[in-house]
Amino acid sequence: MRSEEPKTHVRPSWDEYFMQIAEMVGTRATCDRGRSGCVATRDKRILSTGYVGSPSGVKSCDEEGHEFHVVIHDDGSKTQHCIRTTHAEQNVIAQAARASASLEGATLYVHMTPCYACAKMIINAGIVRVVANKDYHAGARSKEIFKEAGVLFDLMNSELETYPGQAVEEGV
């Protein structure tokens, strides 16, 4: 017998579903400045996951502390980045390679717009679409190269991702 009550459950879209999984994957990250996760999919199936973390067998930020690198931007502003870890996008590609899983034609779900180095790896891995939950302060070049290479880029939320200590004060 059918119920006549209206349904209140709203089923997430595939993009929302895989983004929620990417956010959960990010809870495994080992750097508190970028607890990001990433999921690679094709045909609505997960191929690989990755999160921000130190290389296997190497101490993490959570254990050892951050390894900072200061970046001076074209406008003269400075930001600091932790370079102890491997990005979630790099790890999703590495994990797929270790499992002999091709990412050709895949969609990537990421916490924020990938950095320029990750964008180039994404293109070379054959990934055809990137879906980011938030924007990245230095993501403009990534978006440009995605467009040039024919990689579709979708931003789910226009919010800019920030983290504590991102801007460097003068004299530091």
Where are the regions that the model predicts?
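Zinc-dependent deaminase catalytic domain
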Residues: 1-172
